[in-house]
């Protein structure tokens, strides 16, 4: 830190959590710290009484560093940034909730299909009379199996291919995605190995992030986790976080807070609990409000807060794990539940689907009461939605 630096910004840079719901605008009075040594250039504020000021209390957002300084940071932020929790999924209730939702959707005629599968191949070993390169040997075997012209083998698979083929005596399993036009090879294993096709579903809330890992072959939930959203130190509501992104390097800071500090540690902890390598997660689904979608993808969200409130996207299929630094299989496709408005996001799309409002003749009201609140009203004939602030009072 240097003389003249803002204390709240210095604390954020050092990953010290200070409760600042207004993101440092001096409006909420929550970022209180106590001066224990050294000197701060602090503005007087109505949030700190004269008596408290004499005892060293200051607002971090209204304080500049003069020289070496020691401050006490109260453990206020822990109320927001909860510790990570990995849930026990052995209870019948957890299984029943998921099964009920899945069955209700399927009963309407919607087919839940998985475009990923594991294929087992036995190839002839190369000889002096058969000197075909490894990758062509693999694609030839896959082409016979699937009768597809275009087969894509990414660098990560190509790099491990020679060793896996020879260790397995050319008897392998491949994790592939098949479309009407082509096939993509995600991974390759010895045929003797048990292969789990992992899928990751994440709900990015303004305050809390929840996630599950599933077995994409069986639909079984393998692990579940929740954690406070690391972005909380940049503001409790979406508007203050958008404002934070307008500062130099702000978009990257907000993206790192939700991915590097929140989602990736959750992935590692869940994978550790079920003994699943992270690179065996081949698909990711994200449901979140429109602002969180933009911040997750590292896309400028500033135009969401000013008229006419236009997002960069409602839906996108162009995102992959390696694009945003999600630590799973780098070629994993990230599917984002589509937003339907500037402040009505993919979390509501997903919730509406599962709540079955769209398939019922009677009127229903679906409410997602989070920091950003959304409501959907309607039935099988129509649905309408709106959003409201449901977090900090000054929002």
Task: Show which residues each predicted segment covers.
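N-terminal cofactor/phosphate-binding cores enriched in small/glycine residues
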Residues: 1-44, 211, 225, 266, ...
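Iron-sulfur (Fe-S) cluster-binding segments and ferredoxin-like electron-carrier domains
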Residues: 10-14, 19, 29-80
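FAD-binding core of FAD-dependent oxidoreductases
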Residues: 25-29, 61, 374-376
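A glycine-rich phosphate-binding loop feature that marks nucleotide/adenosyl-phosphate handling sites
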Residues: 30-32, 280-290, 369-371
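Short beta-alpha connecting loops at secondary-structure transitions
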Residues: 43-52, 335-339, 392-395
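Nucleotide/phosphate-binding catalytic cleft detector across ATP-hydrolyzing
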Residues: 52-55, 59-201, 206, 218, ...
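Glycine-rich phosphate-binding loop of actin/hexokinase-like ATP-binding domains
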Residues: 202-206, 211-239, 303-316, 350, ...
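N-terminal phosphate-binding loop and adjacent alpha-helix
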Residues: 230-273
């Amino acid at each position: 830190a240097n003389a003249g630096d803002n204390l709240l910004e210095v604390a954020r840079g050092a990953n010290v959590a200070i409760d600042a719901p207004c993101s440092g605008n001096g409006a909420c009075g929550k970022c209180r710290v106590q001066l224990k040594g050294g000197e701060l250039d602090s503005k007087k504020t109505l949030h700190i009484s004269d008596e408290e000021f004499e005892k060293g209390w200051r607002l971090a957002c209204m304080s500049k560093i003069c020289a070496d300084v020691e401050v006490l940071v109260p453990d206020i932020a822990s109320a927001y940034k909860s510790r990570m929790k990995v849930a026990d999924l052995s209870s019948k209730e957890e299984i029943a909730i998921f099964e009920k939702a899945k069955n209700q959707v399927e009963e309407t005629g919607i087919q839940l299909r998985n475009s990923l599968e594991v294929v087992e191949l036995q190839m002839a070993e190369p000889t002096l009379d058969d000197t075909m390169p490894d990758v062509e040997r693999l694609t030839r075997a896959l082409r016979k199996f699937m009768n597809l012209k275009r087969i894509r083998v990414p660098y990560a698979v190509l790099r491990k291919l020679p060793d896996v083929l020879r260790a397995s005596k050319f008897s392998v399993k491949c994790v592939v995605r098949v479309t009407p036009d082509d096939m993509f090879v995600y991974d390759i294993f010895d045929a003797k190995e048990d292969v789990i096709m992992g899928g990751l579903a994440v709900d990015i809330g303004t305050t809390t992030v929840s996630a599950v890992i599933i077995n994409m072959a069986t639909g079984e939930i393998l692990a579940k986790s929740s954690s406070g959203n690391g972005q909380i130190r940049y503001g409790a509501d979406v508007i203050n976080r958008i404002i934070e992104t307008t500062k130099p390097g702000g978009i990257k800071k907000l993206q790192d807070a939700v991915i590097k500090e929140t989602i990736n540690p959750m992935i590692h902890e869940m994978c550790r609990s079920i003994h699943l390598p992270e690179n065996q997660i081949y698909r990711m689904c994200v449901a979140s409000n429109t602002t969180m979608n933009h911040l997750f993808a590292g896309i400028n969200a500033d135009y969401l807060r000013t008229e006419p409130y236009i997002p960069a996207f409602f839906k996108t299929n162009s995102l992959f794990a390696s694009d945003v630094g999600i630590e799973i299989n780098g070629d994993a496709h990230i599917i984002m539940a589509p937003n339907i408005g500037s402040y009505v996001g993919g979390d509501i799309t997903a919730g509406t689907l599962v709540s079955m409002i769209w398939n019922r003749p009677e009127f229903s009201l679906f409410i997602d009461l989070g920091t950003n609140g959304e409501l959907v009203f309607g039935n099988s004939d129509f649905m309408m939605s709106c959003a409201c602030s449901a977090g900090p009072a000054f929002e």
